[in-house]
């Protein structure tokens, strides 16, 4: 059996069952394990509803049960500067950001990795559902988890091979029921703890409008069809996302009684465009443009290549052709079949089979040459 006792692994422990089992498995495999709880948001803030105190108590219970030292580290400033300000800036632009992608890139696999290295870590480990393979040169390749329903490579798609070379994902080969069973058999306090949902700083109940207007002024405006018919009024463009159905305040009408969906925004005129029907043609795009391109591995794929992509978490893969612009900073993604509700600000994540190649941030979606969101 391999002697891992000289290899130090610092585990990011959230107080949940996944990271608890990560720490347990590594300890059982003989690694020198240290647990670290990250505090990224001030939950004493009048709007914060995170449960950091209770989560830290659970980390302490699990660490004591496993028999590992544990610490707490505060990344509130880094989170505010690198993640939260980005989140607000994107909403100001009328886009719908994904803070989890940026949090992984900037906090969990940058600030935390730097902190772990100061503790003498050889690797960090997290409870993400993903897998890594190493090529002949020893470099890491990001692969989907065995549990396809829980796979989190979408959120890890902005990581670099340099970061991943220092990372372990010890539960990527398990499905969620197995993780809970392992925790239960080991008597871990988190075995039955429910999964955390939603964005840390908003909390699980997701009073999103109330939270957002604390930081950004809302400006009400008209809600109308592409033909100029006013159907109602919106509370502020930042509260709506492309393809949204709920919360519009306008039900189906007429013979067909089809529901209404958000199909576009005009930031300059402060207009929210709506259209009837799930299959409204204004919701379907033939291609998109994206920037902030990031490849996990710096392999030359040429300027054009075919692969699959996801435009949101847990979506089925879509066949696409990727066209890299000459400057290498922007990309055009052409869909094999029209795709619905492509949302600026979200990540488009590229795959080759089970390998996550990287991602870019969506700027605009088009139907032929017409930009959809601007109608």
UniProtKB/Swiss-Prot annotation:
Localization of this protein? Cytoplasm
Region feature (Interaction with target base in tRNA): 98-100
**Which Pfam families does the entry mention?**
tRNA_Me_trans, tRNA_Me_trans_C, tRNA_Me_trans_M
Q: What class of enzyme is it?
A: transferase
Q: Which Gene3D superfamilies match?
A: Adenine nucleotide alpha hydrolases-like domains, HUPs, Translation factors
> What is one Gene Ontology biological process annotated in the Swiss-Prot or TrEMBL record?
tRNA wobble position uridine thiolation
Provide the residue span(s) of the region labelled Interaction with tRNA: 150-152, 312-313
Give the EC number(s) under which this enzyme is classified. Answer: 2.8.1.13
Keyword flag Disulfide bond = yes
* Function of the protein: Catalyzes the 2-thiolation of uridine at the wobble position (U34) of tRNA, leading to the formation of s(2)U34.
Family classification: Belongs to the MnmA/TRMU family.
Protein name per its UniProtKB record: tRNA-specific 2-thiouridylase MnmA
Species assigned in the record: Levilactobacillus brevis (strain ATCC 367 / BCRC 12310 / CIP 105137 / JCM 1170 / LMG 11437 / NCIMB 947 / NCTC 947) (Lactobacillus brevis)
Q: Which gene encodes it?
A: mnmA
């Amino acid at each position: 059996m391999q002697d891992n006792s000289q290899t130090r692994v610092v585990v990011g422990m959230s107080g949940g069952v996944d990271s608890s089992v990560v720490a347990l498995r590594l300890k059982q495999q003989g690694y020198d394990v240290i647990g670290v709880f990250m505090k990224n948001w001030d939950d004493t803030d009048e709007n914060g509803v995170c449960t950091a105190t209770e989560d830290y108590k659970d980390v302490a219970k699990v660490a004591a049960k496993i028999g590992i030292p544990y610490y707490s580290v505060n990344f509130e400033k880094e989170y505010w500067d690198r993640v939260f300000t980005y989140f607000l800036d994107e909403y100001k632009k009328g886009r719908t950001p994904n803070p989890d992608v940026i949090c992984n890139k900037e906090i969990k696999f940058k600030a935390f990795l730097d902190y772990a290295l100061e503790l003498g870590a050889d690797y960090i480990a997290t409870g993400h559902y993903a897998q890594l393979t190493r090529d002949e040169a020893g470099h890491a390749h990001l692969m989907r988890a065995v549990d396809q329903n829980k796979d989190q490579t979408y959120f890890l798609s902005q990581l670099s091979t340099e970061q991943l070379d220092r990372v372990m994902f010890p539960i990527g080969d398990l499905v969620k029921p197995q993780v809970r069973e392992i925790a239960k058999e080991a008597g871990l306090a988190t075995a039955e703890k429910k999964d955390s949902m939603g964005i840390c700083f908003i909390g699980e109940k997701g009073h999103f409008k109330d939270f957002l207007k604390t930081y950004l002024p809302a400006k009400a405006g008209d809600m109308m069809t592409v033909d100029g018919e006013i159907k109602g009024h919106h509370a502020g463009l930042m509260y709506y996302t492309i393809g949204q159905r709920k919360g519009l305040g306008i039900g189906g009408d007429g013979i067909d009684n089809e529901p209404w969906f958000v199909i576009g925004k005009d930031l300059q005129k402060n207009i929210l465009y709506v259209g009837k029907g799930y299959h409204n043609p204004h919701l379907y795009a033939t291609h998109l443009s994206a920037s902030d391109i990031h490849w996990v591995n710096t392999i030359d794929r040429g300027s054009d290549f075919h692969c699959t992509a996801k435009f949101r978490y847990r979506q089925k893969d879509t066949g696409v052709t990727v066209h890299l612009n000459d400057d290498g900073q922007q990309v055009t993604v052409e869909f094999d079949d029209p795709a619905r509700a492509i949302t600026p600000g979200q990540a488009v994540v590229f795959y080759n089979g089970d390998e996550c190649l990287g991602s870019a941030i969506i700027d605009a979606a088009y139907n032929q040459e017409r930009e959809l969101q601007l109608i």
